[in-house]
A protein has these predicted regions:
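A conserved acidic beta->alpha catalytic loop
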Residues: 26, 33, 41-50, 65, ...
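Glycine-rich, basic loop-to-helix element that forms the pyrophosphate-binding segment
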Residues: 63-80
Length: 258
């Protein structure tokens, strides 16, 4: 029997109390109501938990130990019950109240594809600029410069887990994910608002910590994750090799990848 829940929205959070209500409310106001919200809080020290507990519809998971972005998303994935998974960072939000309906309509009209590529608006200061992500084949998707997991809506049964406690976990997961995707369609209008104004974003804080002295060991772990990745499709394997060559060259030259 098909799962009653259609979308699982997974949100990792760490100390994002300033933006969290906007992120949550952008989901709760959706006209399409068949979804679940899973927030994985990664040991926040602000009032994030207090904010989250005000909302009855949210499934809150509190990490006992730091899991970082990759680990938090994996925890959420293990609890997800929807047919499709959407990722959202806790300082970003959905563009308008019709986003879920647009994604759902695209899925139904295209015979339930494995993946839906989501375009977005980039917010810097008070200005939003539209970023179109037309990626209608796995070959185009895997070679995309922008690999953020929140730019893809994926069938739950095909979701690949993220490397944990490492740099560039989105990249490794992206390649592994593309290797499992056969059908993909794109939505050429904004679905997500990517907020570039948050100086306390999880990814930015993790990058700052790496720059303080842990970048080299994280680069080695990133390279190891790429080496361990096994790809069935040649286009994914070629992209894996290219990414690996870049990181190995940067390690050799002492360069930090951001």
């Amino acid at each position: 029997m098909l799962n009653d829940i259609f979308f699982s929205v997974i949100i990792p959070n760490y100390n994002n109390s300033e933006w969290l209500p906007k992120s949550i409310n952008s989901i709760l106001k959706q006209t399409f109501s068949n979804y679940e919200i899973i927030i994985v809080d990664d040991c926040s020290t602000d009032n994030s938990i207090e904010i989250i507990k005000k909302y009855d519809k949210i499934k809150l998971i509190q990490c006992k130990n730091k899991a970082f972005n990759g680990g938090s998303r994996n925890i959420g994935l293990k609890k997800a019950q929807g047919q499709y998974v959407l990722f959202l960072d806790s300082d970003d939000w959905f563009y308008d109240e019709n986003c879920f309906q647009k994604i759902y309509n695209t899925i139904i009209e295209n015979n339930k594809p494995d993946c839906i590529s989501l375009s977005y608006n980039c917010l810097i200061g008070n200005n939003q600029s539209f970023q179109s992500l037309i990626r209608n084949t796995p070959q185009i998707l895997v070679s995309s410069v922008f690999v953020a997991c929140w730019t893809k809506c994926i069938k739950k049964e095909l979701i690949q887990f993220f490397p944990e406690n490492t740099l560039m976990e989105d990249v490794v997961q992206h390649i592994a994910q593309c290797d499992k995707i056969n059908t993909i369609v794109s939505i050429n209008e904004p679905i997500i608002v990517w907020n570039r104004n948050n100086i306390n974003s999880c990814s930015r804080i993790e990058n700052q910590n790496l720059q303080k002295g842990k970048w080299q060991s994280s680069m080695y772990r990133y390279a190891a994750d790429l080496m361990d990745l096994e790809c069935e499709h040649s286009y994914c394997e070629e992209h894996r090799k290219w990414r690996l060559s870049v990181v190995l060259n940067n390690i050799k030259e002492g360069k930090y990848i951001q």
